[in-house]
């Protein structure tokens, strides 16, 4: 099992959190790859190089790290692995005693338990011949069944296979929100349209949102808009409209959420509730 960690000017934080976590769980250096801009390569080698492989690349902004990780994995013939944020603190797993439909998570504190669950995930991945991608903005990584879309937890960890999406029933009635990782979100949009997956399942909208950070960053917002326009130009029969929405959280603060709605060129889809029944309300 390989671990890919894109990072930017946070070598000390990475060493304290994600890398420290992986070290505690007994993950070896050969399985950890940290991706940083060429200008930061020496700094990361000094702070983290003893425990991880530091890979320099030309960081051009949002999405470039994960795109480069994909190229790197293809070149090294690595078929699966985790992509982690650099502030990961702990692994979680679903309690076997949890009632059906409930998600009682337990913290993994020791290396033996971590290795047990990571090994199971690796076996599941091999059995499905899929690519494993993890996104962990809430500083935890869920180790749940790979056929479950982190139900009930919008900041979960999940499995994607861009070549062939299997077990389509898992996409029904699940939150299609995607947080922070806009590049993969748009890959999903393209993959979904190309395979008619989302259209066949009745998806007429897609949500990109965040409760912390993310969309508050202006250049990320502009990047979303430019990608939306790019998609609109790419497909002659379908357009993409990006709609900004504010959500009040429990503390009364505004959170930005972005909705992408597929729009037919001659007949705009009429749907008052753009999110419909396929999404859950995003709250703290």
Residue ranges and their predicted role:
Residues 1, 10-14, 176-178, 182-284:
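C-terminal catalytic/acceptor-binding lobe
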Residues 15-17, 43-47, 92-95, 143-148, ...:
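A short acidic (Asp/Glu
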Residues 2-26, 40-45:
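Short, well-formed alpha-helical segments that are part of the catalytic scaffolds
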Residues 34, 80-84, 131-136, 195-199, ...:
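A structural signal for short, well-ordered beta-strand segments and their strand-loop junctions
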Residues 1-2, 23-34, 52:
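Short loop->beta transition adjacent to catalytic acidic/histidine clusters or analogous donor-positioning motifs
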Residues 8-13, 41, 88-91, 109, ...:
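Short acidic, S/G/P-rich loop/turn micro-motifs used as interaction or catalytic elements
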Residues 35-84, 89-104:
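Active-site-proximal specificity loops/subdomain of glycosyltransferases
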Residues 91-182:
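Conserved catalytic core of nucleotide-sugar-dependent glycosyltransferases
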């Amino acid at each position: 099992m390989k671990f890919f960690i894109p990072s930017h000017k946070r070598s000390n934080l990475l060493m304290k959190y994600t890398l420290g976590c992986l070290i505690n769980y007994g993950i070896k250096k050969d399985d950890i790859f940290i991706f940083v801009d060429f200008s930061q390569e020496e700094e990361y080698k000094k702070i983290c190089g003893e425990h991880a492989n530091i890979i320099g690349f030309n960081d051009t902004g949002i999405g470039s790290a994960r795109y480069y990780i994909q190229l790197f994995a293809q070149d090294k013939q690595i078929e699966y692995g985790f992509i982690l944020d650099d502030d990961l603190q702990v692994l979680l797993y679903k309690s076997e005693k949890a009632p059906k439909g409930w998600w009682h998570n337990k913290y993994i504190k020791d290396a033996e338990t971590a290795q047990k669950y990571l090994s199971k995930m690796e076996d599941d991945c091999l059995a499905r011949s899929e690519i494993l991608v993890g996104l962990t903005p809430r500083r935890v990584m869920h180790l749940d069944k790979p056929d479950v879309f982190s139900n009930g937890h919008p900041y979960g960890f999940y499995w994607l296979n861009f070549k062939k999406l299997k077990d389509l029933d898992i996409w029904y009635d699940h939150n299609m929100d995607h947080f922070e990782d806009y590049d993969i979100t748009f890959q999903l949009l393209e993959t979904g349209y190309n395979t008619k997956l989302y259209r066949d399942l009745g998806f007429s909208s897609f949500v990109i949102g965040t409760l912390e950070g993310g969309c508050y960053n202006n250049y990320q917002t502009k990047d979303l808009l430019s990608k939306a326009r790019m998609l609109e130009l790419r497909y002659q029969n379908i357009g993409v409209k990006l709609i900004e929405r504010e959500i009040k959280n429990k503390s009364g603060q505004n959170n930005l959420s972005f909705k992408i709605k597929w729009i037919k060129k001659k007949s705009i889809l009429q749907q008052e509730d753009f999110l419909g029944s396929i999404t859950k309300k995003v709250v703290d």
